[in-house]
Amino acid sequence: MPARGAPLSRTSRLLLLLLFKVSVSAALSFVPEPRNGTCLGESCSPLIQRRSRDARGPGNSAKDALRVHVPREKLEAEVRGATSWDLPPPRGGDTGVIEEAAAAGPLGPPTKPPSAWRWKSAQGKEPSGHLRRRDPTDPQLFFPTSEGGEMSSKRDGIPQSRQEHSVKTEPRDLFYWPRRTGQLQDSQHRPSAVHEGRTLAPPGRALPQNGSADDWVPDQGGPRRGNTTRRVRLKNPFYPLTQESYGAYAVMCLSVVIFGTGIIGNLAVMCIVCHNYYMRSISNSLLANLAFWDFLIIFFCLPLVIFHELTKKWLLEDFSCKIVPYIEVASLGVTTFTLCALCIDRFRAATNVQMYYEMIENCSSTTAKLAVIWVGALLLALPEVVLRQLSKEDLGFSGQAPAERCVIKISPDLPDTIYVLALTYDGARLWWYFGCYFCLPTLFTITCSLVTARKIRKAEKASTRGNKRQIHLESQMNCTVVALTILYGFCIIPENICNIVTAYMATGVSQQTMDLLNIISQFLLFFKSCVTPVLLFCLCRPFSRAFMECCCCCCEECIQKSSTVTSDDNDNEYTTELELSPFSTIRREMSTFASVGTHC
């Protein structure tokens, strides 16, 4: 028979067991969730996912490294087609990205990233044309790389090398939040809603590690593209002292000598012919016309060419690239036709000396001959304007302006007729240049001078004593024309050699050799324009006497020392010489004129 307290003890024991089970179940049900972010999919709340990403840094979780990738083409198509932050996530991607985008709103990503940001290029390739590299206000895309990423990868149990390998092999599956440039990374300002969507970050740019987006620096791993905020500066050719700087000093000194001598000499020739009544013949007018073009070459083209040679930049850019070759080729045409006209004029004088010097040509005849020379030279040089194009080449130095070259290249934007004519001229330019500007003046002048010299020798044998001095001056003038032709041919040979090398041996010749040939041909052209008046003063006594008279009239000492009797004798002697000069059109009956011409 059970005791009286047995039911009570059994009931109390059952209550204790029930209470123990309830307490154990309650204790097990209130265990907190782990904070290492191991929950997957929608089982994790947005708050836990956000907190986990803030602790590890975005893009460094184990799920990102183990993500199943979709094809790149489809992924890029989704990126380009997206117009807002609400984009469908990639297959197997993290759903927390979309919730984070919704929390951030349409104005941009959450501010204050946990680490520094830098550019990341996607396999060294440029993105498609939706991003413009040159506009600093375009959206720029970043992703974090810092020490926090290494620690988060260790906490997730994924080695850093494996994580970097996954990023390097498949970089196009990483999508980053766009940010506008010009804002500090720790700033609370949010980007404008104009730039929306996700885009791959373009290569070739990098931000400094201080987080400033204002001072751009070129990426170490790729070529420089687009404009930078660094001011490009011209190359200083004179400092520091190197072999190139010594060459720059030599070029500058030589150009100063050519410039000064050419300007003074050609101005003197034009002044003598224009201010001296007895020197206004057809031959002297042709020489004054030649002096004008030589003056134009030295005054306008020489400074531009020297500036380009020293700084590798054209001063007036595309205009100077087109106008300098045009003026140079037109000057060659003027020299060619002038030498041919001088040879014809000398042949007429040698055929009948007495009739030639009794014949006076009026101003309209001289103007017509000069107009034919000008129009022919300008029209033949016109295709040079169409062929020349300005090209820029990077020197490979940081902060240096790109080198500019004036190359022969036909623009495809020309009309069809002009384009066909330019192609035809380009194909025949080598032999046209060689035949018209080298063979024509040299061969024609040498042939005509030989015939003229033969006529002069025959006239000298049959002449009287009074005509021998005139024939001697004709022979002197003939030698002057031959000397001018030899000088012209010597200075034009390097230009033809440069054209032949460019046409047939351009692949086997370095760019430095081509530049050297080009600058030599340019300097020889300037040298020809400089030496022509000097040669004229040395070989032609009337020009030298007129030049000395022009110089002495500016000196008071010469005027004070000259007496009336001496000046009358000198004027009579000078007038007699001018009558016999081949440069003069004075009649023999006009020997009573005492004055030589107007003063300077």
From Swiss-Prot:
Residue ranges annotated as Cytoplasmic topological domain: 274-286, 344-366, 452-480, 540-600
TM region positions: 253-273, 287-307, 323-343, 367-387, 431-451, 481-501, 519-539
Listed GO CC annotations: cell surface; dendrite; endoplasmic reticulum membrane; plasma membrane; receptor complex; synapse; ubiquitin ligase complex
Residue ranges of the region described as Disordered: 103-228
Disulfide pairings: C321-C406
Matching PROSITE patterns: G_PROTEIN_RECEP_F1_2 (PS50262)
Keywords: Cell membrane, Cell projection, Disulfide bond, Endoplasmic reticulum, G-protein coupled receptor, Glycoprotein, Membrane, Receptor, Signal, Synapse, Transducer, Transmembrane, Transmembrane helix, Ubl conjugation
Signal peptide from the UniProt entry: 1-26
KO phenotype (gene knockout): GPR37-deletion mice exhibit a significantly higher number of myelinated axons and thicker myelin profiles than wild-type mice. Therefore, deletion results in accelerated myelination. In addition, mutant mice exhibit enhanced Listeria monocytogenes-induced pain behaviors compared to WT.
Domain of life: Eukaryota
The protein's assembly and partners: Forms a complex with PRKN, STUB1 and HSP70. The amount of STUB1 in the complex increases during ER stress. STUB1 promotes the dissociation of HSP70 from PRKN, thus facilitating PRKN-mediated GPR37 ubiquitination. Interacts with PACRG.
Protein name: Prosaposin receptor GPR37
Species for this entry: Mus musculus (Mouse)
Lineage: Eukaryota, Metazoa, Chordata, Craniata, Vertebrata
